[in-house]
A protein has these predicted regions:
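Conserved phosphate-handling catalytic cores of large alpha/beta enzymes
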Residues: 159, 163-176
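N-terminal regulatory modules in eukaryotic regulatory proteins
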Residues: 180-235
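Acidic beta-strand-to-loop metal/phosphate-binding motif
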Residues: 68, 121-128, 135, 139, ...
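P-loop/Walker A NTP-binding module and the surrounding RecA-like catalytic core of P-loop NTPases
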Residues: 65, 133-137, 142-147, 155-157
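Domain-level signal for Mg2+-assisted phosphodiester chemistry and nucleotide/NA-binding surfaces
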Residues: 21-116, 145
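Short, glycine/polar-rich helix-capping loops at beta-to-alpha or helix-loop-helix junctions
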Residues: 75-80, 150-159
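Intrinsically disordered, low-complexity linkers and terminal tails enriched in Pro/Gly
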Residues: 21-32, 171-191
C-alpha cells in the first residue's frame, strides 16, 4: 500500500513546510570524491590490492584503475586474478633498456593526462619509488588530493609529498613485509619519545579556549606533519 500524506489547506494554498514537522527535510548531499588509482606493479605486492582498494573507498570512488608493468615478465603473473576481480586495466610497458624504468615514465605521463583532461578530485599513487615525488607535488599544486601507498622502505621524500600515505603492510590481506619489525609493545610505545612529542604537539595545537581538542582536528594536525601516521601501526 502506498502512503499518501494529506497536506493541510489554507486560504493561500497548502500549508508551508514549517507547519509539517513530520515530513523529513531533504538535505543536499556532497558527491563522493573521484580518484584515479595508478599502480606501479614493480613496486607493490598483489596481496595488498584488496585492502588497498578498501582503503581508497574510505576517501571516495575509484573512477580510474590502472596498473603499469611489463606483463611479459613472469614475476607479474600473480596479478592476473586480482586484475580480473577488481576490474583494473593493465597497461603494457616494455623495458627498452636494462636499468631504465619505463614503467615509471608511462605512469607519470598518464597521470598528467588525467590531471588536465579528467574531472578528478584526487590521485592514489601506489609505489615505493621516489621517482613519483615530483608527480605527487605537481598534482597537489593543482589543488587535488594525493594518497600514496607503499612499503615501509619508501623514501621519505615521496611520503611527505603526499597528503596521506598508507603503508601496505597494515592493509587487510597484505602480508607483513618485514617480520623482523613487529608492532611495538605497549611498554615500547611509552618510550617512543618522537611519537609522544608529536601527539602532544597535535593536541596542544588543536585546543580551544577551554582546553578541549577535537579528535578530527588532532588527526588533521598529525597528517600535516606526518602523512604516514596510522594508529594501526601501533597495535
Amino acid at each position: 500500500a502506498q502512503f499518501v500524506a494529506t497536506l493541510p489547506w489554507t486560504s493561500t494554498g497548502f500549508a508551508p513546510r514549517e507547519a509539517l514537522p513530520f515530513l523529513p527535510r531533504m538535505e543536499p548531499t556532497t558527491p563522493p570524491r573521484r580518484f584515479a588509482v595508478l599502480i606501479d606493479a614493480d613496486n607493490v605486492s598483489a596481496t595488498a590490492l584488496t585492502g588497498l582498494l578498501a582503503e581508497v573507498a574510505n576517501y571516495g570512488v575509484a573512477m580510474v584503475k590502472r596498473i603499469y608493468g611489463d606483463w611479459t615478465l613472469p614475476n607479474l603473473k600473480s596479478w592476473k586474478e586480482q586484475l580480473l576481480e577488481h576490474a583494473i586495466q593493465p597497461i603494457q610497458q616494455f623495458r627498452y633498456t636494462v636499468g631504465k624504468n619505463a614503467t615509471d615514465s608511462a605512469l607519470i605521463i598518464d597521470a598528467m593526462d588525467l590531471l588536465y583532461r579528467s574531472k578528478l578530485d584526487g590521485f592514489c599513487l601506489v609505489s615505493s619509488d621516489s621517482d613519483f615525488t615530483r608527480l605527487a607535488s605537481r598534482i597537489r599544486e593543482e589543488g587535488l588530493m594525493v594518497i600514496g601507498f607503499g612499503e615501509r622502505k619508501t623514501p621519505r621524500a615521496f611520503v611527505t609529498a603526499c597528503d596521506r600515505f598508507v603503508h601496505t603492510d597494515i592493509l587487510r590481506g597484505a602480508a607483513p613485509e618485514d617480520p623482523a619489525e613487529p608492532k611495538k609493545a605497549p611498554s615500547a610505545l611509552k618510550l617512543d619519545r618522537k611519537l609522544i612529542d608529536l601527539l602532544r604537539w597535535a593536541v596542544e595545537a588543536s585546543e580551544d579556549d577551554d582546553g578541549w581538542a577535537n579528535l578530527g582536528a588532532v588527526g588533521a594536525k598529525l597528517m600535516s606533519q606526518q602523512p604516514d601516521f596510522d594508529s594501526r601501526s601501533y597495535g
